[in-house]
Structures are given as C-alpha cells and as structure tokens.
C-alpha cells in the first residue's frame, strides 16, 4: 500500500474510499506534493498564548451534519473538523466544508441568532500575533489516532459570519480546488464592511504585518483591509438606552423612532418610552394638577434660576400682586429725620453709616445740621449737579442764594414779602402799645407833680400872711423845703423818670439773658431768650488751658475737638464745649434742645476721660444728636433772617423819616 506523508497527514490508497470523493483526495495529494517535504506541514501549529474574540455581532448558523453513506464512515472512520475557540485567523483563513452535494441540503436548515461577545485584548509577543492551531487528522482503523464522529463546532462555524439573504463577505472560505466559496457557491469578494449592521461598527480582523503563515492558505492572494482615517481618529462614545439607561454594547442592534434622537436597546423599551405617563405638576396658586402637555404659564422666581408653573393666566395676577407688595415693603425704610416708614429718596453715608431720608425737606434738614454744602435750590430743595446749571442767584442780606429756576425765585420773594408784612404789622402794634404805656405813665406822673406844685403855692401864700411861731416850726421847715423846688423843673423830673423807667425795663430784659461762656454755670432749664442768645453768639471752646487730671491721672485734651473722617479729612466738633468750673464736657446742641439724662446734655456733663473718644463717636452718630443739630441750624438761620428783616425795616424807617423832614422844610 502506497503511502504519502504530508506533514502530519498520511494519505493512502484507501483515503478516497474514506472521504467518498476522489477529487478531494486528489487535490489534497497535489497540495501535499507542492510542499515536497514532511518538514513543511499542511497547517501551521502555534502553541503561543490565545487570542481573544472580537465583540462583533456574530450570526450563528445551526447546520445539520450531512449524512454520509460511505461504509468507511459507518465504521467510525470519520472526518474531523476542529477549531479552537480562541481562534483568530490571519489574513484570509480557510475552512474545508463538507462536499457540495451536502451543502444544498444545509441551506434550508439555517437559523439566525444575534450574539454579543465581550471584547478582549489581543496578546502579542515581539510584535507578532500568536494564533491557535487548526489542523485536520485523518486516521485508519487500528492506528494511533482514532477516528471520531463528525464534529461541527459552533465556535468554528460561527466565524464564517454568513447570513441568509444578506450575502455578506465570508473571508477565507474555499473549496477543495482552492477557489473562494461563499454561501454554498462560488462568488467574488464583497466590500469588507458590507456585513456591518446599521446600528454599530466593528473593527475588522486583520493580519499583523511581519507574520508569515505556513498554511496552504497563505499561498493564496491576500487582501489587507485597512480602516479608514475617520474610524482611526474617532473613539466610540458610550451610548445608553433612553428608557432603561443601560449602556449599548459594541455591536448591539439599536432601535430608533423616526424623527427622534433617542436610541433604545429593544422594541420593548421603544414602546414603553413612547407610552410613558405624562408628569403632572401642581399650580403654585390654586394647587391644581396641570399636565405638562398643556400650555402652562411659567414664570421665573426672583433671586434664583428656578421657575414657577401656573395652570392659567388667572393664577399669574395674584402672584404678581404679591411680588409687587413685597417689593414695595422692601423698598420702604425708616427716615433718619422724621422717623417715618416711607420710600427713601436720598441716602447719605457718613462715617460708614448710611442715613436714609424720605423727602427733600428732610434732606435739607440733614444737610443744614451736618453742614453739607451742596448745590440745592433754596426754595424747593432740588439738587443741582453743577454750579453752572443754574444762574438764578438772589442776594438777600448780603448772602447769595441759588435757585433752580425763575419761578422758585418769584415764589421765594412772595413768601419773604408776606413774612415782612406780617412782621412789620406786629412790630408796629408792639411799638404803639409801648408808646401808649409810656404816655400813660408820663401823664400820670405829670398830673401828680402839678397837683403837688399847686398845693405848694397855696401854702406859700398862707404862710406869708402868718407870723412865725414855735408851734408851727416843723411845718414851716417842711414847707420851706418843698418850696425850694423851682416850678420850671417839673418837665425835667418827668424826663428823668422816663429814662429811669426805660433803663429799668431794659435791665429786666437784659440781665437774665446775659450768660457766661462756661456751660457748667448755665441754669438747668434755659428760656427762649437765653437759647436765642446762645445760638446767635456761640460760646468759644477752651484752648491753651492746663486741664486738670482726675484720680486715675487722665485729663481732657484739645484733640477731642477734632474729628478724623475715614478718608483722613479732619473736621472740628464745634458743638463740644469744656466747662472749667465742673471739669466736664457738654454738647451744645443737646444742651439747648435735648431732653433726658444723657451725659453730654445734663447739668453735670461728661468727665469719663478713659472712654470719651468712644462716647463722642457714638453720640455724634445718634439720631438724637442729629435731630438737635437740625433744630439748632434751623433756629440759627431763622434768627439771621429776622435780623436781616429788622435791619431792612430800620433802613426803611430812617428813609421815611428823612423824607418827611425834607418835605417839612420845603
């Protein structure tokens, strides 16, 4: 029996009977002769590390094994087709199929199943890919390698990647003659990406460069499939199902509804996602449920990025009204001057303390109290940004007063004229009353003097006729003393009495008003005239004085008269007075207009030198001090106006008097 050894294969004359096909044996013999030496095996075996599977969509074909009627197969002389599970072919790999006559019966028994495998890395050694071996053994009865049943492995057949009706490219399948075989017939290669599903793309199995295969398949023409540049640059992004949020694996079929951007893993998720129950939202005002499909009214919430939903426009109006009320309450604040809760129009920051003023009137009071020099109209108090805005200046009593417009000047003039008329009428009435009283007193005094003079003359005539006697010596002496007054001196006596009376009245009005500059000597309660004189004539501050020390060794210093502002500017505290008699300090504004038992406004003053700086800073920022300073400034301005009016009246009176004298002489 002739034997031909090809690598690990032994071919005998009985081999055709075993295979049942002489043509297949002949072709195998030719392939064996082409190598020429047993050292060149038919199939290369590699015992290196395995190569993991791809995570492709694998289409598994369930094929019934063909029935072979040869007696050799009945005697368990079988043809074995084995393939490793971890097989990765290099280039165009080949699988020897059953005879063509059996393939026709297999087409009707093919079923399709989608399997998703996990992707594993390919282990390499020295840059060369290591492949598992796929070999064919044919043995005779009684030999070392026994025959086995025909084994169609699912893992080996799954690599064929065939699908009925789609006709994808099936790399490496060939017939015995060496031609490419596809789906049971001879066909040419299709595009390498024609088998990829629409939902995902998979990397192709390519042969690593530099690795040579010793299999007969390596002698065939090889096709290297290179991925495109776009596939090399872009990395696959993680995509999840829109319904169940499960990640879609590589190669998994995804479902998408037309016109929608959502992807789903299965039809169940697709149908359940489209029929989800709409979320109901509760209206903010009426607390009714409103479906999100309806055209709800959505408004943003203040001071946040959230939104509020309303069932209709009727619920929006009460919400807006509440917002407006809250805005109005928040915008209102308490005025520093009048202490009213109103809308603030002016804000003044002094020493990092913001004073809020509700109106122009309160602003003018605050401005006068703190000595703020601003461009404001004297009549309406409107602020003028620059001095060049208004050229309406009125000079009254040597002082320039600015106005915003001509109408304010006219109104101010009318107001001053009415005040002057009222003052002149009252002054005339007062003067007339004083004159009448003086005339009455003078008339009464003159009548009494005349009566005395008449009685004296009558007595003189009687005494001239009588003789002198001792009994009436005293009477005659008295009469002589009275008679010694000349009758022409009556008018002089009346004039001197009038002068003395006027001086007495003047002293009565002046003596209690005159006060010393020491606030410690002032009475506890000041009357109106005393307060006016102190406002007109401000007491001087004590300087260049040797201030005494107290028990702790502390004393008053002139540095307390100066206040340092936050910007470094220095201002004088003109309201702070030092009493040498009581060794204490007083607040002039609070001493004149204040009430209560504050240290700086009572009759004893403040002498806490250790905490004086803190007391002064706290006191000058208090509301009581600011109000008293406003009253002081207002009274001072009123007294100046009255003086100006009195001076004008005197000038008018003198002019009228001079005019009357001139008329008399003409």
UniProtKB/Swiss-Prot annotation:
One of its GO terms (cellular component) is nucleus. It holds the Pfam family zf-FCS. SUPFAM superfamilies: Glucocorticoid receptor-like (DNA-binding domain). It comes from the Eukaryota. GO terms for molecular function: zinc ion binding. Residues 87-106, 191-212 are annotated as: Disordered. A zinc finger (MYM-type) spans 262-296, 308-348, 355-390, 401-428. InterPro entries: TRASH_dom, Znf_MYM, ZnF_MYMT-QRICH1. Residues 194-208 have a biased composition (Polar residues). It is found in: Nucleus. Keywords: Isopeptide bond, Metal-binding, Nucleus, Repeat, Transcription, Transcription regulation, Ubl conjugation, Zinc, Zinc-finger. There is a cross-link at residues 85, 88, 146, 163, 222, 440, 452, 459, 549 (Glycyl lysine isopeptide (Lys-Gly) (interchain with G-Cter in SUMO2)). The keyword Metal-binding applies. Coiled coil: none annotated. Interacts (via N-terminal 120 amino acid region) with ETV5 (via C-terminal). Functions as a transcriptional regulator. This is Zinc finger MYM-type protein 5.
């Amino acid at each position: 029996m002739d034997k031909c050894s090809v690598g690990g294969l032994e071919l005998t004359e009985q081999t055709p009977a075993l295979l049942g096909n002489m043509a297949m044996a002949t072709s195998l013999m030719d392939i064996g002769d082409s190598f020429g030496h047993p050292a060149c095996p038919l199939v290369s075996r590699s015992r290196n590390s395995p190569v993991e599977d791809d995570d492709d969509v694998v289409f598994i074909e369930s094929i019934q094994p063909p029935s072979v009627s040869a007696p050799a197969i009945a005697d368990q002389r079988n043809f074995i087709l084995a393939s490793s599970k971890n097989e990765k072919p290099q280039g165009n790999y080949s699988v020897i199929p059953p005879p063509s006559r059996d393939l026709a019966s297999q087409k009707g028994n093919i079923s399709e199943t989608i399997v998703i495998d996990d992707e594993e890395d390919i282990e390499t050694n020295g840059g060369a890919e290591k492949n598992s071996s796929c070999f064919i053994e044919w043995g005779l009865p009684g030999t070392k390698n026994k025959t086995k049943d025909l084994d169609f492995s699912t893992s080996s057949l799954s690599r064929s990647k065939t699908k009925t009706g789609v006709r994808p490219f099936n790399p490496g399948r060939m017939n015995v003659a060496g031609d490419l075989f596809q789906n049971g017939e001879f066909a040419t290669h299709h595009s390498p990406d024609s088998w990829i599903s629409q939902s995902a793309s998979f990397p192709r199995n390519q042969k690593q460069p530099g690795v040579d295969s010793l299999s007969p398949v390596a002698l065939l023409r090889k096709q290297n499939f290179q991925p495109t540049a776009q596939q090399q640059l872009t990395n696959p992004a993680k995509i999840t199902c829109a319904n169940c949020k499960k990640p879609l694996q590589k190669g998994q079929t995804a479902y998408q509804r037309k016109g929608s951007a959502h992807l789903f893993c299965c039809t169940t998720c697709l149908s359940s996602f489209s029929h989800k129950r709409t979320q109901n939202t509760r209206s903010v005002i009426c607390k009714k449920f409103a479906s999100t499909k309806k055209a709800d009214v959505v408004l943003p919430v203040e001071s946040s990025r959230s939104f509020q939903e309303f069932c209709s426009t009727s619920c929006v109006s009460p919400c807006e009204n509440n917002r407006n009320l809250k805005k109005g309450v928040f915008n209102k604040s308490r005025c520093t001057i009048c202490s009213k809760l109103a809308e603030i129009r002016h804000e003044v920051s002094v020493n990092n303390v913001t004073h809020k003023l509700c109106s122009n009137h309160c602003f003018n009071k605050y401005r006068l109290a703190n000595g703020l020099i601003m461009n404001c109209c004297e009549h309406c108090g409107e602020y003028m940004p620059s001095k060049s805005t208004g050229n309406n200046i009125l000079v009254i009593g040597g002082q320039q007063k600015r106005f915003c417009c001509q109408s304010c000047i006219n109104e101010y003039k009318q107001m001053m004229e009415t005040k002057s008329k009222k003052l002149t009428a009252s002054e005339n009435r007062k003067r007339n009353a004083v004159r009448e009283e003086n005339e009455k007193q003078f008339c009464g005094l003159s009548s009494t003097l005349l009566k005395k003079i008449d009685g004296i003359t009558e007595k003189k005539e009687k005494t001239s006729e009588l003789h002198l006697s001792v009994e009436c010596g005293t009477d005659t002496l008295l009469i002589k003393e009275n008679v010694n007054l000349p009758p022409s001196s009556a008018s002089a006596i009346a004039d001197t009495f009038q002068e003395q009376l006027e001086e007495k009245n003047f002293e009565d009005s002046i003596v209690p008003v005159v006060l010393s500059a020491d606030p410690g000597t002032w009475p506890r309660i000041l009357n109106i005239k005393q307060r006016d004189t102190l406002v007109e004539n401000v007491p001087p501050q004590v300087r260049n004085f040797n201030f005494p020390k107290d028990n702790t060794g502390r004393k008053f210093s002139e540095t307390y008269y100066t206040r340092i502002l936050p910007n470094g500017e220095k201002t004088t505290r003109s309201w702070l007075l030092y009493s040498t008699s009581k060794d204490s300090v007083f607040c002039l504004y609070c001493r004149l207009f204040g009430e209560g038992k504050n240290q700086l406004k009572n009759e004893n003053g403040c002498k806490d030198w250790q905490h004086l700086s803190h007391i002064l800073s706290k006191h000058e920022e208090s509301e009581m001090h600011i109000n008293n300073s406003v009253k002081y400034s207002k009274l001072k301005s009123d007294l100046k106006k009255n003086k100006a009016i009195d001076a004008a009246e005197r000038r008018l009176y003198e002019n009228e008097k001079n005019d009357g004298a001139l008329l008399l002489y003409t």
